[in-house]
């Protein structure tokens, strides 16, 4: 819960996501039971018929004994939450609230919880990521739950923060412990972030340095706001935390076409178009329209149910589908479009190398998640990465590559087959695995470091295939560090099993500039 770090854009009404072509596949997925079943419409109810979201837990009735966790009594401190942000109701059953309002949780299920306002006694659904339990750390502006060290750095270095901006977060390595992250400046590296382990006393207190101990984290913050006492900076203000994206509407999975108002065509791909649209007059989304006949509706629905379960900060969120032809795929809206277009734009072409490495690290984090879940992307390239207004990169188009029914795309001779991104064993034998994704990631790194240049410039597809068979690999561009190029070369090993894992690639890219020094400051 809490987790105020999930959205990256202050101006984003409900997420951002512009989708090109899709592509993540569970290697061995048993399709039984994967089709959503339609719900009988209520005869008196005006409005769309919704099909349950395949990822949401079974609904509990408002009076269900299991609505709350075991041992939790309604109205006890455990069930009272406080609003971290204002929320204006947009669905019929929602409850509006102001930052600071307190509510009793009646039912916890999925991303929308049923609650009653203590002030107005009104009941309705609330977005669970907008509230925190009273007296919990999450009510503190400076506490960021479940955020990684790398994302803490991204947040603190973002515009709107200053010297001494800080956050306390859960430790990634030690369960139940915390870390303090502080924005600093040093002449050699410029703006930077320093991390301090917060250690725990046997008596339950906290300290960074044994000479200054505190009974609570709140006390620790007050102390280091007065003076730096050995830290790199005196703590100034909590890290800026924009409102998170509101969760997608409850149970709106297969939606009626009429609920989408198409507004602006963002692009056209091989299999359809991408539009900016508004869902039910209140939520900005991206809609990918698929040309009729490009895939079977049954195969698509089975794959979409699967893609919906892949939820990660660095993957574009799949919100809903229109399941009759022409198929519509509804995702979060991403303000800056594809990474390929962004890198070629005026803003993108000015991004310094450390930012390019950060883009690469974000993509490898998303791919490490896909790897961990035993999925495959099959079409990893800069055109299928989307960029948010605050330059967060998210992977799109996972899942669709496998179900496209177009020989131009599926056969290696086809005009649409992405030869230059595809591993030799996938070209020659149709063998797509996470290791062929690793090969594609090496090509994607080259796209990033050359600001969107087409791989193997000047070479035709047949020439590329022949060159690869003779051991040719793209040379290192002048602006590309040796360490980055060596990752590419490892991604392009002939034998798939010799290519690194995405988990390993992420660990190298996350610490690309700091691998030689300790991530955490020594005790002050």
Swiss-Prot record:
ATP binds at residues 266-274, 288. One of its GO terms (cellular component) is plasma membrane. The active site is at residue 379. One of its GO terms (biological process) is cell differentiation. Interacts with ADAM15. Interacts with FASLG. Interacts with ARRB1 and ARRB2. Interacts with FCGR1A; the interaction may be indirect. Interacts with IL6ST. Interacts (via SH3 domain) with ELMO1. Interacts (via SH3 domain) with TP73. Interacts with YAP1. Interacts with ABL1 and ITGB1, and thereby recruits ABL1 to activated ITGB1. Interacts (via SH2 domain) with FLT3 (tyrosine phosphorylated). Interacts with CBL. Interacts with VAV1, WAS and RAPGEF1. Interacts (via SH3 domain) with WDCP. The modification Phosphotyrosine is found at residues 50, 207, 409, 520. Residues 1-20, 35-71 are annotated as: Disordered. CDD domains: SH2_Src_HCK (cd10363). Subject to autoinhibition, mediated by intramolecular interactions involving the SH2 and SH3 domains. Kinase activity is also regulated by phosphorylation at regulatory tyrosine residues. Phosphorylation at Tyr-409 is required for optimal activity. Phosphorylation at Tyr-520 inhibits kinase activity. The modification Phosphoserine is found at residue 460. The keyword Ribonucleoprotein does not apply. Its EC number is 2.7.10.2. Belongs to the protein kinase superfamily. Tyr protein kinase family. SRC subfamily. A lipid is attached at residue 2 (N-myristoyl glycine). InterPro entries: HCK_SH2 (IPR035851), Kinase-like_dom_sf (IPR011009), Non-receptor_tyrosine_kinases (IPR050198), Prot_kinase_dom (IPR000719), Protein_kinase_ATP_BS (IPR017441), Ser-Thr/Tyr_kinase_cat_dom (IPR001245), SH2 (IPR000980), SH2_dom_sf (IPR036860). Keywords: ATP-binding, Cell junction, Cell membrane, Cell projection, Cytoplasm, Cytoplasmic vesicle, Cytoskeleton, Exocytosis, Golgi apparatus, Immunity, Inflammatory response, Innate immunity, Kinase, Lipoprotein, Lysosome, Membrane, Myristate, Nucleotide-binding, Nucleus, Palmitate, Phagocytosis, Phosphoprotein, Proto-oncogene, SH2 domain, SH3 domain, Transferase, Tyrosine-protein kinase, Ubl conjugation. Residues 76-136 form the SH3 domain. It catalyses: L-tyrosyl-[protein] + ATP = O-phospho-L-tyrosyl-[protein] + ADP + H(+). It comes from Rattus norvegicus (Rat). Residues 142-239 form the SH2 domain. Disulfide bonds: none annotated. The modification Phosphothreonine is found at residue 200. This is Tyrosine-protein kinase HCK. GO terms for molecular function: ATP binding; lipid binding; non-membrane spanning protein tyrosine kinase activity; phosphotyrosine residue binding; protein tyrosine kinase activity; signaling receptor binding. Residues 260-513 form the Protein kinase domain.
